Regions:
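Feature of Fe-S/electron-transfer and energy-metabolism proteins
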Residues: 1-121
Length: 121
């Protein structure tokens, strides 16, 4: 199992900080949805018909017990109590509110999970 080192943690934490700012700019109207789209896709965030969806990578298809607990926490706290495992070894949360996405991503980052490189677009 791949274990994150300090470089990985710093990279993911910085991405979360950047995305938090980008979400604030989107919510304030400073960014249009078209301008926001490539920024959210870089972080595994898709706009569905009724809500945003967050796709999280499962590193090498393996989860630690701490990571599984964090996924459960995110499902309970930010979604509707469940997630969807994909055929590409990712998990999707389909009902996270845009304003809560940065907090969910920060929680996931503490467990070494993120949505980078999960966008097929």
């Amino acid at each position: 199992m791949y274990i994150y080192d300090e470089f990985d943690r710093t990279l993911v934490e910085e991405r979360v900080r950047e995305f938090r700012d980008q979400v604030a700019r989107r919510l304030s109207g400073e960014l249009t949805e078209e301008e926001f789209k490539p920024l959210r896709l870089m972080n595994g965030v898709y706009l569905q018909l009724h809500a945003y969806m967050l796709r999280i990578a499962i590193p090498y298809g393996t989860l630690s017990s701490d990571q599984m607990r964090m996924l459960a926490h995110v499902a309970r706290r930010y979604d509707r109590g469940y997630g969807h495992f994909t055929t590409r070894q990712n998990i999707q949360f389909n009902w996270i509110k845009l304003e809560e996405l940065p907090d969910a991503m920060a929680d996931l980052a503490r467990a070494g999970l993120h949505g980078m490189q999960t966008s097929g677009n």
